[in-house]
């Protein structure tokens, strides 16, 4: 199976967690896009979705799924999204698609976070994938200096503006042995909107696409 076929398999497998009559939290990226396609087959059974990016909102609306503003929603049963890396503790690096802040907000509201990923995203130690940090534009250089002090090699993601109007620094060279401590340390830097470490709020269920089928890991 190709990588895209593995992503499709986990996207469709996540449908089993969707309850009729509910509002579904939806992530961003190539794997989440397959989940949105699958969700389209249930559009008459769900109330709608909350989306983590303009791109996902457009795709959901194109399939006829009503998209709610998060401010209109009291609670979410599930949030389904991909990951750039996921470790054995269900902690993740996310933000390759620059939607990390909205993803983290929706994940914090949802009762259950379901991570969908192909097996290549499983790692023992987070950090080989560059760690994205969303930053207020005027603070870019100041934040970068602080990230160097934390042992990273930040690079400005040229030409990318987030849906919130901010910029992204990708931090290379991090071997993240204590993801919660690093998430807290980076989030404490003035000018950081959020870091793409999902350690304090990790996944509850991981659906991993393998050549032998979809593997389910429960926290």
Curated annotation (Swiss-Prot):
Disulfide bonds: none annotated. Belongs to the ribose 5-phosphate isomerase family. CDD domains: RPI_A. GO terms for molecular function: ribose-5-phosphate isomerase activity. The gene is rpiA. The active site is at residue 103. Signal peptide: none annotated. Its EC number is 5.3.1.6. This is Ribose-5-phosphate isomerase A.
